[in-house]
């Protein structure tokens, strides 16, 4: 009886040891930097917008197009040797952080504005674009914040515009939507008086909807847009920072601008107003 008891205890001990080693092994796997994971996988997973031309959208053939997309494909080329070794994953503004935390994407390239609040939850690489908030309305009737009193303002959930007006102007009623298509459709259908978003996007949209104008072209701080990754991946962050330096010094950002943004903005906007040189 005693012998059987000893065998049982010894068996239990071995099981516990196996569990400990398994846990240690899993912990080691979890600590592997995202850069190593991407190289082993052979595919770069990038979160982009699917409804925000000319930065990230899907064309009639189901292909992703836009400024963010072109830069992301160059990242895949420089990291994995082939710009096609990339998987674009559509993401809404309010889900960008969660997609990183859940490892659904390696990098967010969805017009993500670098803010102090977001720094607490994700790591930003060096920026590739300049941006500020703008407000668009029919005929540009809204020319200052005071004119929004007792009126509704459209914003996208989880965007800089959402945070800015919620924090600084809590008395302005916000009409919030997840998707950019919903946001602009609401403005076209007169669901609210005006819409607040990145001025770069509003300028592009106004080019196709001439009855709408930016009455407020720049609001609040001038910000930057940068690639974002999940915290705790220093090797990937270092690689991204070096990559951004390279894309700027080689004039690749200028080339991407000419390919995707210049046809939209024309001569009204100078490249240096938007991109880093």
Where do the language-model regions lie?
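Short helix-initiation/N-cap motifs at beta->coil->alpha
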Residues: 31-33, 86-98, 140, 175-185, ...
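Acidic, polar ligand-binding/catalytic clefts
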Residues: 73, 77, 85-147, 214, ...
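C-terminal motif of bacterial Sec signal peptides marking the signal peptidase cleavage site
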Residues: 20-23
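Periplasmic-binding protein-like
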Residues: 50, 129-139, 199, 203-245, ...
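Extended ligand-binding regions for polar small-molecule ligands
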Residues: 25-29, 70, 74-78, 151, ...
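A ligand-binding cleft/hinge motif common to bilobed small-molecule-binding domains
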Residues: 95, 112-120, 164-167, 181, ...
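Extracytoplasmic small-molecule ligand-binding "clamshell" domains
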Residues: 29-109
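Ligand-binding clefts/hinges and TM-proximal coupling segments of bilobed small-molecule sensing domains
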Residues: 26-29, 39, 163-177, 213-218, ...
